Amino acid sequence: MVIDSKQDLPQYTKDSGSESDSDSSNNFIVESPSIPSSKSATVVLNSEEYEDDEGDDLNGLDAELIDNITYEGDEDETMFVGLKEKQKLHLSGVFRLQVVKGGIVYNNVHYNASREILTFWHPLSQSIPTIDFSHFAGWQDTFFMPRNNRFKIRDEEFKSFPCVLRVFNSNHTGLLEAGHLYRDVNYLWKPKEPYFPLNERTTYHLLHESDRIQSLSVPGYWSTPLEKLYLSHKNAAYDTRIMVIGGKNSGKSTFLRLLLEKFTQDIRDSTTSQEELVYLDLDPGQPEYSLPDSISLNKILSSPISLGQHLCQGSNFQTLLQFYAGSSSPQDEPTSYLNCADKLIDHLEEQAFFGTSLLNLPGWIKGFGMQILNHIIRKYKPTHLLFLETANSKRHLDELTIPQSFSTSLRDAYAPEVVRVPAHSLNHTLSSRFHASQLRTFKILALFHKITQFDYDFAPLLKSAPLQISYGKGKSGIKGIQFPMEFQDLNPQDIKSALEGTVIGIYTYSGEDSLEVKSLNTFPILQSCTSSSKNFITLGLIHSIDTSQQIMNIYVPPCHTQILDKQPEDAQWIIVRNKTETPFCDFLPSPRTITWDDNIQIPFATFERRKKLEHVWKVRKNVMRRGQFMKR
């Protein structure tokens, strides 16, 4: 969607304290491009060609975009968009973008025209950030047109546009096909009935006001704390520790994402390589970088440039340490959760880290959740503590206990800077479209169907063969099975059914002492095992168990098989059964997603509909109703 903005960029929503966006962020008008302002800066335009290994009709685009868009329709579904002053663009999906001429502003960060390729992730479960027009920030504007595109497009076509963008398909193949297996996310990346229909191969979509999308509007009262935190990151002599606290749907993840995008762009522009950025992802229910139901410590990479909400599918981070929490909320096993969080923070301390770290927490701020927050504050020792307040959460946040000063191995006593900012719910109109449980299922499916870093195959797992792993005494495979505390007294006859069709955590044991296990119906049940002696590897999905041969059939994410292969041959394997939800669409796929061999006879099952007058006769028990008495 190309629209004309009524305000100069960057644009903020002036919110009066409510959690809704202003009208200007929800009402989009698609208009023909206006004539550039006479006050626009005069720039000298150089033309620079370069080779591009990525691979003029409009294909039915609306007439109101003809002057702005040139659609090539090549193998990458390339589209060139020209923007004039005060115009902006809305796109959904996963796509790559190059600023060919001028510049753009995205989430209040400026990006100049260059050869750099930006990868954008815009799911419709989130508010869609706008790609705003901007001029080239420099002395001499340059036209970075790939040579293979220059043969098809004349310079005169975009001469009147101060900003030109090249939008083309993502290099992630198969990701948008998750809806074929899990229908709830069929329209996660694209509108159900797009106003501007493009080729089916496109991984992005132009958005229109009729698509009922919500624009990401950054409120004005967020701009000041964002700018202050950026200056603290840029000018800090020691490490900077930023912690954001708030209730559910208060905008914690969005606020941290805005900070990250600003910090990473600053690191790319910096002449030194000493600045580092790490992210403590402690929200197992809605993680930004962790595996499903896990918490982790991650190093953020400045390249490749990944913008937006990637739903844990991005490649701009490196996981330093990760623990499987086993559920979407810390309230299920708070002690285990805190132990894992402490180990992540201890690992950060051991690195003598001088850069900037950010910490994301779940929105549990009531009852025992407040004790968890107080514990992590004392452990993490933030330099900056930001509260995102609402009318309901303000009284809970007043119960926080914040020490007056902290001290670490890198610096002596320092006082944390505490800032209270009104929360801003950015996705309130979209809450009925995608629920958190649906997004969690999508992330689990994406994990088990991820072939390589960029390739996905959402064919049902039943069409592929699982790994066969032995278990039990005298076997070289799984040495121990761990259940949650409330299932320690599980009936031995129920262990098999409690494991089949469930998601498990796969660990290796590194303790010096031998594992303390108890054999129950051939299953080696762990009696005690400290978390410090377990190394989390990945998640698995148990297909079935053969108790006679003591073999488990387990699906492992294809992208993680190399991690398993790197483990030593004498590694002692442990699996942990917890409360992660199973994606049943993999085990019970719809008939249209899987075809059976005609030679396979499945008893008592049919995928054919009965004829109109065909009925199934069922024998009913005589319950001695009045009409069922036999006459004599």
From Swiss-Prot:
Effect of K252A: Abolishes kinase activity and termination by RNA polymerase I
UniProt cross-references to InterPro entries, sorted A to Z: Clp1/Grc3, CLP1_P, P-loop_NTPase
Compartment list: Nucleus, Nucleolus
Pfam families linked: CLP1_P
GO biological process, one term: termination of RNA polymerase I transcription
Broad class of enzyme this protein falls into: transferase
Induction comment from the UniProt entry of this chain: Cell cycle-regulated with a peak of transcription at the G1/S boundary.
E.C. number(s) listed in UniProt: 2.7.1.-
Annotated residues for binding of ATP: G246, G247, K248, N249, S250, G251, K252, S253
Record field: compositional bias (Polar residues): 26-42
Keywords: ATP-binding, Kinase, Nucleotide-binding, Nucleus, rRNA processing, Transferase
UniProt-annotated stretches for the region Disordered: 1-42
GO CC terms of this entry: Las1 complex; nucleolar chromatin; nucleus
GO molecular function: ATP binding; polynucleotide 5'-hydroxyl-kinase activity
Its biological purpose: Polynucleotide 5'-kinase involved in rRNA processing. Required for the efficient termination by RNA polymerase I and the processing of the IST2 pre-rRNA internal transcribed spacer localized between the 5.8S and 25S rRNAs. May act by maintaining the phosphorylated status of the downstream RNT1 cleavage product, which in turn allows the torpedo activity of RAT1 to efficiently terminate Pol I transcription. In vitro, displays polynucleotide kinase activity on both single- and double-stranded RNA and on single-stranded DNA alone, but not double-stranded DNA alone.
PANTHER family per UniProt: CLEAVAGE/POLYADENYLATION FACTOR IA SUBUNIT CLP1P, POLYNUCLEOTIDE 5'-HYDROXYL-KINASE NOL9
Family statement: Belongs to the Clp1 family. NOL9/GRC3 subfamily.
Protein name: Polynucleotide 5'-hydroxyl-kinase GRC3
Organism, scientific name: Saccharomyces cerevisiae (strain ATCC 204508 / S288c)
